[in-house]
């Protein structure tokens, strides 16, 4: 009898151990696959926050406005490479697998990070300085074009049934962790270094940290396992067939791009551009602007999985439409309140509200985008739609916001840009879910 009881006890605990092991394996996979996403966003946020110092170092001009515009133009140029990277690297990932492809994107991304740390100033090497910065941004844009799509699809393919929204939200969640780390480092530098030291060389320290963690991220990525869904698929399209399938489904790609427009505009407005907006437009201290950005990233980190989980429960369409309508109704009025009464608390309140809208919308949008693409070109299709939106909307949000304020005199005018992106997202959502019964086409 004791033996029988022990046997029954062992058999009853075996499923629990298996579930715990499977859960631990999925958590490990999430950490490994999102590590590269962390590096990408860490670097992009730093470039946005230290834009004034980068402008001074690499893009000297007759006026601060012109210098800053050139810096943000180079920042945006990297996004123009994203659609090319999405097609080329996205097709490669769809052909050879998620694991191999994501190691390649990380390698290219790391090269761009190394460049920004090592390039001497304009006064030292002249025109080579801005040219090399541009090359670094183009390389990072090329790799980022497929990095985000590859990570999102990987998470969608390892998700447990009915929890795809929750799982894919951690792609964007890793970006928020990157912003938290970058903002915390910037806050610490402001506390220990004089402004002149930060302007001369101190701004490079966070970028150096990014370089130092690259080997550890490579180790994590190499331990990734291929998804069962990709392995089980018997037919993998050749590169030419991937391009043909994307062309056959161009309407889905364009509608997907418009759906992403809302999320990428909101994200770059409240994170990448916000520190510069706080310092240069609202005249808040650099430390206050950084602290607001840090708290906004924490807010994003909370709302992203909530949005994903709610979309699992109530459907993607409901969450997407609700958030686009909220953005359309409140983006400009909220920024007008901030412009009329600029303070740390007001900036924090307004950006936390926009963070709620962004987090809820993006939590539903990422799984929706993985679901509307044909399985054979899921990474390439997702990446192309996302990259086009980032190139047209998100990447140029800082420069468009700067130009709108300069030429209209309205400090709240970035709200017009976000409202326009919300209209795009609303129309795309209605279109995609109205045509959900239409068969997607695969080129054979």
Swiss-Prot record:
Q: Which residues cross the membrane?
A: 42-62, 73-93, 115-135, 138-158, 178-198, 200-220, 252-272, 290-310, 319-339, 341-361, 380-400, 412-432
So which stretches are on the Cytoplasmic side?
A: 1-41, 94-114, 159-177, 221-251, 311-318, 362-379, 433-444
Mind telling me which Gene3D superfamilies this protein's record contains? MFS general substrate transporter like domains (1.20.1250.20)
Q: Which domain of life is it from?
A: Bacteria
Query: Where in the chain are disulfide-linked cysteines found?
Result: none
Q: Which residues lie on this side of the membrane: Periplasmic?
A: 63-72, 136-137, 199, 273-289, 340, 401-411
Molecular function via GO: symporter activity
Q: Name one GO cellular component term.
A: plasma membrane
Where mainly located?
membrane
Q: Which SUPFAM superfamilies match?
A: MFS general substrate transporter
Give the subcellular location.
Cell inner membrane
* Membrane topology field: Multi-pass membrane protein
PROSITE patterns found in the cross-reference section = MFS, SUGAR_TRANSPORT_1, SUGAR_TRANSPORT_2
Which UniProt keywords are given for this protein, alphabetically ordered? Answer: Cell inner membrane, Cell membrane, Citrate utilization, Membrane, Symport, Transmembrane, Transmembrane helix, Transport
BP-aspect Gene Ontology terms = citrate metabolic process
Function recorded in the entry: Uptake of citrate across the boundary membrane with the concomitant transport of protons into the cell (symport system).
Q: Say which family it is in.
A: Belongs to the major facilitator superfamily. Metabolite:H+ Symporter (MHS) family (TC 2.A.1.6) family.
Q: What else is known?
A: Allows the utilization of citrate as a sole source of carbon and energy.
- This protein is called what? Citrate-proton symporter
What species is given as this protein's source? Klebsiella pneumoniae
